[in-house]
Amino acid sequence: MKTRKKISARLLAIMLAVTLLLPLTWNVPVEAAETKQIDVLFSHDTHSHLNSFSTIVDGEQKEVGGFARIKTLIDEKKQEDPDTLVLDGGDFSMGTLIQTVYETEAAELRMLGYLGYDVTTLGNHEYDYRSKGLANMLEAAKDSGETVPALVVCNVDWDSMEQDGLSDGQKQIRSAFEDYGVKDYVVVQKGDVKAAVVGVFGKDALECAPTCELKFKDPVEAVKQTVEEIRKNEKVDMIACVSHGGTWEDENKSEDEILAKEVPDIDLIISGHTHSELKEAIQHGNTYIVSCGEYGRNLGSLSMTQKQDGRWELTSYELIPVSEEIKPDQATQKRIDALMDTVDKNYLSDFGYTREEVLAENDVEFNSLEEMGTKHEELNLGDIMSDAYIYAVENSEYYDGDPVDVAVVPSGTVRDTYTKGDITVEDVFNSFSLGIGKDGVAGYPLISAYLTGKELKLAAEVDASVSDFMTTARLYCSGLNFAYNPHRMILNKVTDCYLTRADGEWIEIQNDKLYHVVTDLYTGQMLGSVT
């Protein structure tokens, strides 16, 4: 009995000591070898900007961007950490002359592979060349034999399309997806970190893709289901998402913030589509959302460390300016130059141009692209675009002599500004580069239509009511002016609407009269749902 008491006392003392030491043990830092860490580089919305380009930075004209400089940054990072994960959030195409060889050369996707990107996804502009164009591009990328990034998108609704019967375009894309190896997600091993990367196509992205024939599941539900599948079938350390959903100022409408809240198992979201430039990561729970802006002006860089509960903490985050100070990788630039020679030969030669040919000397300080759509005001960049529409139509061989009353240009279709100095063929193309025509030639064609005065007024009402929330839909018009009261009810804000002539004359709009309106095909497709 005495012995048992001694043993009990000793046992109690040992247990007490262990209990007291446990908190100290929990607070001791884990050895570096046991702590998992990952470095990530990322981009999105590069829009065929393989070459550097001239723009205004802090009031000064500078050359920024370019895949040759991005290659330098990626190589430098991989010298520090060979296991760096490199991701892209989609819309890698459509925005420069490079897009003219999209179908035949798959230049953008192949260059992403050459730079060392691991995974990307599809944005709405990958569908600009329609189903056949996207399918041809994917086949060209695969047939090149070069290393290309994995392509992931989890919410294509093939079941729904099959029930309705696949169209020829849908069949083409499905075949190309299968040949390329497009998946819902991929698992990437980076050192001791096993990461799953899922891709998703957002709701607003689909609304901005009038030529897309595919049907899509709800993004949140599709990602949720995919993450459950990953958790069930893959032993991964982290889950990242390359999303073409985007972020908005209104958190309740911000697609990737909604995704982060609804699917909390995601550790990291690379957020494309809205061209957001997040100086600081957005955090919801244990999920981080990051964006670095468009056109390769910046390269996103971050590091994450795994915590003891298995989740990841963002330990560093920066947007690296792809500036003149960064030395371009010469081998990369040589590849880009060869692609540009192909553009000259296969596209521009048909029009009697070369990419570096000077079309005009500019002494005007045009608005920056960032200013477009931010608020209701006259901008000289929007004005010259809409005036150019009228000039082009009235000097076309197809012009029937009926004067154009109104030209309409949404801010989202303007892709670049003009800097002072020489304006080249490439500059002009880049400023208005989207889409293709019925003939398959790059660039959305202009279209003429006749709208009633009532329909013109409705377009003005939509602009006054909606464009504050959807700045890419802000209209810049030549020939149409309106006044509005921002405090009135939606679709009842316009107080006056009239036509203006070049000589300054104001003309009252009559509801039942037809007016000659010019816009581009993309805008015409979008305006069709309004008028």
For the regions a protein language model found, what residue spans apply to each?
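Sec-dependent signal peptide cleavage junction
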Residues: 21-34
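Bacterial N-terminal signal peptides
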Residues: 13-23
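Generic structural marker for isolated residues within well-ordered, non-membrane alpha-helices
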Residues: 17, 256, 386
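Solvent-exposed loop/linker segments at secondary-structure transitions
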Residues: 47-49, 94-98, 112, 231, ...
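Bacterial N-terminal signal peptides that target proteins for export
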Residues: 2-15
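Acidic, metal/ion-coordinating pockets
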Residues: 32-325, 467
